[in-house]
Amino acid sequence: MSDYKSTLNLPETGFPMRGDLAKREPGMLARWTDDDLYGIIRAAKKGKKTFILHDGPPYANGSIHIGHSVNKILKDIIVKSKGLSGYDSPYVPGWDCHGLPIELKVEQEYGKPGEKFTAAEFRAKCREYAATQVDGQRKDFIRLGVLGDWSHPYLTMDFKTEANIIRALGKIIGNGHLHKGAKPVHWCVDCRSALAEAEVEYYDKTSPSIDVAFQAVDQDALKAKFAVSNVNGPISLVIWTTTPWTLPANRAISIAPDFDYVLVQIDGQAVILAKDLVESVMQRIGVTDYTILGTVKGAELELLRFTHPFMGFDVPAILGDHVTLDAGTGAVHTAPGHGPDDYVIGQKYGLETANPVGPDGTYLPGTYPTLDGVNVFKANDIVVALLQEKGALLHVEKMQHSYPCCWRHKTPIIFRATPQWFVSMDQKGLRAQSLKEIKGVQWIPDWGQARIESMVANRPDWCISRQRTWGVPMSLFVHKDTEELHPRTLELMEEVAKRVEVDGIQAWWDLDAKEILGDEADQYVKVPDTLDVWFDSGSTHSSVVDVRPEFAGHAADMYLEGSDQHRGWFMSSLMISTAMKGKAPYRQVLTHGFTVDGQGRKMSKSIGNTVSPQDVMNKLGADILRLWVASTDYTGEMAVSDEILKRAADSYRRIRNTARFLLANLNGFDPAKDMVKPEEMVVLDRWAVGCAKAAQEDILKAYEAYDFHEVVQRLMRFCSVEMGSFYLDIIKDRQYTAKADSVARRSCQTALYHIAEALVRWMAPILSFTADEVWGYLPGEREKYVFTGEWYEGLFGLADSEAMNDAFWDELLKVRGEVNKVIEQARADKKVGGSLEAAVTLYAEPELAAKLTALGDELRFVLLTSGATVADYNDAPADAQQSEVLKGLKVALSKAEGEKCPRCWHYTQDVGKVAEHAEICGRCVSNVAGDGEKRKFA
């Protein structure tokens, strides 16, 4: 028997079947770095329209976690897809380098500033620590396949950036948004510092819930208000609170002007309560026998005075819109030094902003004899005992409620009034302008808009001062006596900024005021405060984007971070940009959800359900991680587990196998010489290119809308359904058995070439390593890297006017599916071994029959059978299978007649008819020794 294997065009490629990504990717990365791939892309894109995705800086502390990976991969997918869409999209990664977490790390190792080290040496240690953290994180980000200017990232501790942060503050001061005040701010007693809104987390805490009676100073005035004369015992206004420790700072009781308040007689005293809450209060304090004596509106009680239960002074009843009927008594204990609402109403009524608590969370000397020096969280029981002793406690119980805690220490925080610097939301219309700017931004997903709007509408003034060592100095001088800013503040800040640009922030602490103030130095003091670290990152639109040459003065198009950044970076950036320039710093804001495990639980080291990106890359490769990110709908929580990553690896194999099939069958194809013109191609091949064209339209639209899971789904459908289970199956016969240089084969290779050119580009933003690998095996002249080009423009399809148009082939796909079902059943019944052992008769109604007949002898190639005939639907025998999908089709199967050709494996009756090639069929003889078979349709 002759060996006809050498006459076949078997697939061949050096592109490996297995990805071995964990082993291969580092080598590719080394090549990207050696070649300066990022620089090559920048040169290729020079002069194109820009798209700037501004990197929100991660904090330079600790290893990257899975959330970091999601964030950087999403950014990279966008930047690369924008590049392929014809944009110049530079990406400059950044890091947030100042602030408390770094200070705490350095303190752990070296002690607090001023102990073993001077403050200057401490700052140098912080700078050193941050730099090592940046290096560690940078390696991991690069390993993810993220392309950017890693050699020149921006760091908020770069001297120039530090100087520009000071300049940003100067601009805000110049625009009139800064003011000083003793306002209550979130205060962590462990950090001994004010906290930003975004540094506060909420946890359940158990606190005493108490009802306290404040006795009326003028009992007769109250009786007159309620129009009653007989009251048994003293009259009190009752407040309810879960923070007894704040009572020493009480300066008023807030009531609602429009609520009804009633005077209620209970045993031996009368109490004033909101009418709607009487029942719940009586139940709570265990009173069943009570009488309502009279009713008034809250407004009637304004400025009546009540005695503080133990502080020895009296306080007014005041009117406030923040009073609700959700819980309590309808009268709210008001301590302007311990709460933002209390502070605002206190300002309105000119109340003292009392702050009896020191930075360490203990009461200051002179507060109250039994409280001085006591930690506020240990004081609740002392205060409750005091109230009991004074006869003012109506009720106490333990209550679990959500309480603000420090994000770093996880310990409860307090509101504490301290002298601080604030960016005012309203004195120059910052709130109103910010709300207006929000409307001009595209928020993705769109619920982000309502979220940030409500935050901006309700937020207090922004406390931007911190009492820390490692941070950008506020660089202000205030008058010793008046505490007013120096009249030349803006000029002086610029002078400081110039020095910081040369020597870093230490220049401020080394500065002798005389150097820039001259004779005035004796009248002014340097403000020791540093800026809130959120001011550092929030001003990068000015300190980085406005000054980096690659951005050429263009504003950022997009900010992209986790959904917690509405109150973090998106907010601080919006505030600073609007305060500086009157406009938002971004055009689009995209947020992604948090990562959770396969059961939807939050990632936690204590549960042991964290997924380390480093482990995933070392085991499966970065492309698998990238594919998981892209295939997950990032608008909600993003589930990740070993099982989920395994599914991503399965999808990856499908895509890789498709790419490998294309490359293997392009063996020996030179696009410059072998390309077949569209009009001369086999119809099915043109259909396949048209499928790629339709897929490309969907994929590009999805990239444009940032719907990457749609990109992956469409890519998978193309590889698995349109190519894998239909086209690539059908063409194997023609590809392998036709004459090597025949139009039949070259037509097929032309289609595969166009498809491969398109596919490699669709993959590139997501499967960057694999796309680069595929690119290296594609035939024809090309640039060195897929990332420097644009989407493939060589695709074409079938015209709707053609008889065998897309609709024709869509129907053929269905027919093929129905025939496959019958073949599978026959295989299960052991009637045939494989589909080529079968011959089928398709009993079809006239319209479908005409389409099937049009394919002539080539119908069998579409169906992958050795024989295929078409007959009238009404002539179908009883054993023909009725199609479930196509009502006008029945399929009958029989064993193919004739012998199996050892070359093409088809069963045919002309095997051995040609003496010189006695073992093979007539079609194969033509392909081996004759002019080759002609194919028109399939």
From Swiss-Prot:
GO biological process, one term: isoleucyl-tRNA aminoacylation
Entry EC no(s): 6.1.1.5
Entry binding sites for Zn(2+): 901, 904, 921, 924
Enzyme class: ligase
Presence of the UniProt keyword Metal-binding in the record: yes
Compartments in which it is found: Cytoplasm
Domain notes: IleRS has two distinct active sites: one for aminoacylation and one for editing. The misactivated valine is translocated from the active site to the editing site, which sterically excludes the correctly activated isoleucine. The single editing site contains two valyl binding pockets, one specific for each substrate (Val-AMP or Val-tRNA(Ile)).
Function: Catalyzes the attachment of isoleucine to tRNA(Ile). As IleRS can inadvertently accommodate and process structurally similar amino acids such as valine, to avoid such errors it has two additional distinct tRNA(Ile)-dependent editing activities. One activity is designated as 'pretransfer' editing and involves the hydrolysis of activated Val-AMP. The other activity is designated 'posttransfer' editing and involves deacylation of mischarged Val-tRNA(Ile).
Complex formation: Monomer.
NCBIfam families in UniProt: ileS
Protein's name according to its UniProt entry: Isoleucine--tRNA ligase
Organism: Escherichia coli (strain SMS-3-5 / SECEC)
